């Protein structure tokens, strides 16, 4: 009860909820509890907003960027989660924004002063879309052919050129090469970008490729992230290295296929995971890492409360939640 409440809505169950759950002898009480939690749209949204803010680099609000240079997507993201917008629709609106509400993700951060070429807006675009949505770390490849993965400088710049308004010269370790990048998608088996198209057309083509029915990379990446968030460790680990061998490839493929075939429904996939025996089993305090480094799943890994969960728990237990806030909010004050 405590685990699933914190995982799905970020809040501890109340004493009344705990007593009612323990007194309920019906065999489907866990399923009903999970459906009730997922139906608490505001609590669900405000809890999972933290996960998506981190993933989409929307939590950055420091002073390093030029004023007005980057628009956060908080309003769009909040509504997408509250409405349980399908993930493929979210991806389309992030990659090829239909309006200003979701532009912040691809626009990146305009740093003050002179910065490395690897921090230019087109390269940030390449790094962000590949890491967040494909589980690919393009940061090394943005400077030189990666030493730790298969990705090359040309592939990193190929993605960057999709976004770039101007011809984009490849720089290796901040030194110009004289080579102009050609807009390209790194998985040509399912299609390719037309380099001669306009920027908006290229972004539309890229969005189509991200949600292509034969693109298994995107659904695998997001279900692996959801599994990792709930279980403490992904089926593929690290989460941003999807080229790593999964500890159970069949499980990953099945979850990704189910996700695709059922409308990219995030809540449905969360429900699928938390109703499983794997999630509801006893926690694994040692983390499942056996001698030699091989991972064996022995149960969910214990997780610390997040900062948000900790504050909410203190407010809930002490009855000290603020009576007024300095910004609009939707979550009810716990009494």
Which positions does each model-derived feature cover?
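Cell-envelope and extracellular/periplasmic
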Residues: 211
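Glycine- and hydrophobic-rich flexible loops that cap the catalytic core of alpha/beta enzyme folds
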Residues: 199
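Flexible, polar/acidic helix-loop-strand segments at domain edges
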Residues: 195
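Short, structured secondary-structure elements
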Residues: 1-192, 203-206, 215-257, 264-335
């Amino acid at each position: 009860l405590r685990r699933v409440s914190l995982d799905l809505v970020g809040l501890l169950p109340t004493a009344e909820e705990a007593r009612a759950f323990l007194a309920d002898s019906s065999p489907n009480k866990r399923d009903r509890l999970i459906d009730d939690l997922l139906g608490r749209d505001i609590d669900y949204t405000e809890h999972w907003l933290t996960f998506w803010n981190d993933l989409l680099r929307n939590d950055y609000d420091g002073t390093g960027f030029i004023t007005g240079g980057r628009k956060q997507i908080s309003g769009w993201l909040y509504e997408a989660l509250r409405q349980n917008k399908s993930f493929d629709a979210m991806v389309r609106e992030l990659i090829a924004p239909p309006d200003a509400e979701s532009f912040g993700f691809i626009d990146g951060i305009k740093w003050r002063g002179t910065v490395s070429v690897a921090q230019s807006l087109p390269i940030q675009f390449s790094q962000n879309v590949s890491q967040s949505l494909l589980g690919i770390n393009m940061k090394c490849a943005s400077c030189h052919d990666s030493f730790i993965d298969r990705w090359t400088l040309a592939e990193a710049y190929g993605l960057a050129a999709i976004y770039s308004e101007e011809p984009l010269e490849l720089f290796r370790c901040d030194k110009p090469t004289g080579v102009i990048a050609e807009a390209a998608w790194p998985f040509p088996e399912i299609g390719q970008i037309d380099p001669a198209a306009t920027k908006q057309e290229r972004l539309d083509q890229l969005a189509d490729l991200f949600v292509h029915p034969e693109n298994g990379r995107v659904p695998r990446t997001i279900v692996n992230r959801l599994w990792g968030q709930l279980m403490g460790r992904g089926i593929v680990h690290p989460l941003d290295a999807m080229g790593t061998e999964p500890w159970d490839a069949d499980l990953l493929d099945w979850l990704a296929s189910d996700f695709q075939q059922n409308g990219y429904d995030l809540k449905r996939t969360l429900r699928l995971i938390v109703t499983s025996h794997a999630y509801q089993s006893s926690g694994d305090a040692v983390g499942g890492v056996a001698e030699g480094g091989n991972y064996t799943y022995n149960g969910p890994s214990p997780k610390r409360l997040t900062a948000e969960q900790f504050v909410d728990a203190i407010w809930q237990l002490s009855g000290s939640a603020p009576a007024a806030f300095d910004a609009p909010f939707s979550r009810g004050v716990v009494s």
